[in-house]
Amino acid sequence: MDIDDILRQVDPSSHGVPSEARDLQALTRLWVAERSAPELLEWPTDGLFERVNARIKTQIEKVEDMTGDMDPKTNFALIVIQTELERYKFLMRSFLRARLAKIDKHTLHYLSSQELRDRLSPTELSYATKHQALLHNHYLSSFLASFPQQLQNLNDTAGNISMIDSPDLDTAVFIRMLRDKDVYGKGTDADITLPATNGDVLIIRWSSAKHMVDVGDAELV
């Protein structure tokens, strides 16, 4: 089973699917979306990561209890549990690394407004704040201290030119349509609106795709 197989399975909100499968589908979707989007996406607030972390902890304890048992049947079950455990751990690590890479690259940007700070988890916000403070102190001790006071800010916007480096929202992304909809896209020469049906895969600027992804009309792939 590959990523597309997981994403094509039944809707994760369906009550007919076990909660473990729904969480795995949701985590996989978040992982794919975070790696595909050029900017940091909203941190999930539905308790998904708390449930996944609790499940990982339970599975680790189960593996520790089963380790050392020489029964072949138990050993086979142990292999299955370890394989599932590694899948969850890989998705979690890769998802968090993708987010940290974006925070490291555009720290000031994500600290520049409350709306952007709300995208971060409490741990990420603490990390970004401390990271930026350490970086600023390093710059001060290295060279900024020799500059005039008015030139020491790293977020200066004088002359309507911002020093804050921001993500490129016009980066091209691939999206899969989740319902029939007319898709508006910005082009270099002209803008265009095209009809799209459920299941279509499109390449489009993130600035045009973001709203559709946010409201559930499409998903990143």
UniProtKB/Swiss-Prot annotation:
A biological process term (GO) from this entry: double-strand break repair via break-induced replication
Subcellular location(s) per record: Nucleus
Superkingdom as given in the UniProt entry: Eukaryota
Keyword Disulfide bond assigned: no
Alphabetic keyword roster: Chromosome partition, DNA replication, Nucleus
One cellular component term from this protein's GO annotations in UniProt: GINS complex
InterPro entries: GINS_A (IPR021151), GINS_bundle-like_dom_sf (IPR036224), GINS_Sld5 (IPR008591), SLD5_C (IPR031633), Sld5_GINS_A (IPR038749)
Oligomeric form and interacting partners: Component of the GINS complex which is a heterotetramer of SLD5, PSF1, PSF2 and PSF3.
Family of this protein: Belongs to the GINS4/SLD5 family.
Role played: The GINS complex plays an essential role in the initiation of DNA replication. Has a role in chromosome segregation.
Protein name (record): DNA replication complex GINS protein SLD5
Species, as recorded: Gibberella zeae (strain ATCC MYA-4620 / CBS 123657 / FGSC 9075 / NRRL 31084 / PH-1)
Gene that specifies this protein: SLD5
